Design a protein with these regions (language model features):
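Short, conserved secondary-structure transition motifs
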Residues: 251-252, 276-294
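His/Asp/Glu-rich metal-coordinating catalytic cores
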Residues: 6-73, 78-82, 87-255, 261-276
Length: 294
């Protein structure tokens, strides 16, 4: 029989290897037994954020034992959740990588860019890494339990549910022995996002590991955000000025383009803004990576 507890308490339990005292470097180990665990995300550290083992933006080598980690589940493909995969491979991880179908399509693009910037630009090494990555990717549908083929005689399943953060994002429900459920939220989106369905809610959870990137900040609604954006554009048109908007390549950029198109479409047909030439407002997306995603 498998022991019912380990050095940190009864199974299952969670070890946090990143995004503990900061918001980047997400890596959470769901420990199922002495022989088996599943890693949820393996992200890049940014700024001054560090992991409990000392890893940080200047030292991305994996600083935790990977010998019992038999699978990796990704919540979404932002770099602070997936950026350390090259170092995870180098540390000896050789298991499957589970994620949603859209994430499986986006992940090689994200990591090709990250690999060239952080590891090597040599075409042969980039191609070798991407081949290894794609061999291990296992796309999962939303809202279906998937059995994990783990050693150690313990039954474990995962289920992805929509998180509404970016295309392909999910929160992960992890179930041990058909009963105990641990939920990892990943990053959660807003209920009124313009191009994505709202996040689902978990049916039940014995343990909930939830992000708190924005703390207790109250976010304004979509209408208020769009009104502020439109006011900036009107001012730029009047002054013949420029609006510069920094945005993540995946998610924010596409939402901005959608909102800009909506504003332009409405105002081209509005008598209120006849004195403004909306056709004279060029929109320039200055990001090769964002262009590929879009």
């Amino acid at each position: 029989d498998c022991p019912s507890s380990g050095p940190y308490g009864p199974f299952p339990y969670v070890l946090h290897h990143g995004a503990v005292s900061g918001v980047t470097g997400s890596a959470h180990e769901w420990v199922i037994s002495e022989q088996a665990s599943v890693l949820i995300d393996c992200g890049l550290f940014q700024g001054r954020d560090k992991g409990p083992g000392g890893a940080g933006a200047g030292n991305l080598a994996i600083d935790f034992d990977v010998s019992r980690i038999q699978a990796l589940v990704l919540t979404h493909v932002h770099i602070d959740h997936v950026g350390r995969l090259p170092w995870l491979f180098a540390a000896g991880f050789s298991g499957p990588i589970y994620c949603s179908g859209p994430s499986a399509r986006l992940l090689p693009i994200v990591l090709e860019d990250a690999f060239r910037l952080g590891v090597s630009r040599a075409p042969a090494r980039v191609e070798q890494f991407l081949k290894l990555l794609e061999e291990r990717l296992v796309p999962l549908p939303y809202d279906h339990w998937h059995d994990l083929d783990l050693q150690g005689g313990v039954k474990a399943e995962v289920r992805l549910q929509r998180a509404g953060h970016i295309l392909g994002s999910a929160f992960v429900e992890c179930r041990r022995q058909g009963s105990h459920i641990t939920v990892f939220s990943g990053d959660l989106g807003a209920a009124d996002a313009p191009i994505l369905p709202p996040p689902s809610s978990p049916e039940e959870a014995d343990v909930l590991v939830i992000e708190s990137t924005y703390g207790d900040r109250l976010h304004e609604g979509r209408e208020a955000r769009q009104a502020r954006l439109e006011a900036m554009l009107v001012r730029a048109l009047k002054d013949r000025g420029t609006v510069l908007i920094p945005a993540f390549s995946i998610g924010r950029t596409q939402e901005l383009l959608y909102e800009l198109e909506d504003i332009l479409h409405r105002n081209r047909q509005s008598a209120m803004h006849d004195f403004l030439d909306w056709s004279a407002l060029p929109i320039v997306l200055d990001s090769p990576l964002a262009s590929r995603f879009t």
